[in-house]
Curated annotation (Swiss-Prot):
The active site is at R21, N39. GO terms for molecular function: acylphosphatase activity. Coiled coil: none annotated. The gene is acyP. It catalyses: an acyl phosphate + H2O = a carboxylate + phosphate + H(+). Pfam families: Acylphosphatase (PF00708). Residues 6-93 form the Acylphosphatase-like domain. Belongs to the acylphosphatase family. Keywords: Hydrolase. It is an enzyme of class 3 (hydrolase). NCBIfam families: PRK14444.1. This is Acylphosphatase. Gene3D superfamilies: 3.30.70.100. Its EC number is 3.6.1.7.
Length: 93
């Protein structure tokens, strides 16, 4: 059985208007992680990544840099119990 993980992540810095959500979706699909990503009104980006632990860890690591125009200042990671509810990866508008 696979070792599953779920990370609930909040990314701070210049992370809106820099293609962060689309880049996160593309990378999540590449590494095989399910979940979602959205902008928050306070300027942060929030995301949930669920899947095989090694793939979720790759996504969390990616959040510390993000796409080339992003300037990540902080990443708050909350590890949660996997729910199995996520199907695919989507941008929430």
């Amino acid at each position: 059985m696979m070792d599953m993980a779920r990370a609930h992540v909040f990314i701070s810095g210049r992370v809106q208007g820099v293609n962060f959500r689309a880049s996160a979706r593309n990378y999540a699909r590449e590494v095989g992680v399910s979940g979602w990503v959205r902008n928050l009104e306070d300027g942060r980006v929030e995301a949930v990544f669920e899947g095989e632990r090694s793939a979720v860890q790759k996504m969390v690591s990616w959040c510390y840099s993000g796409p080339s125009h992003a300037r990540v200042e902080a990443v708050d990671v909350r590890w949660e119990k996997p729910t199995g509810e996520e199907r695919g990866f989507s941008i929430i508008w």
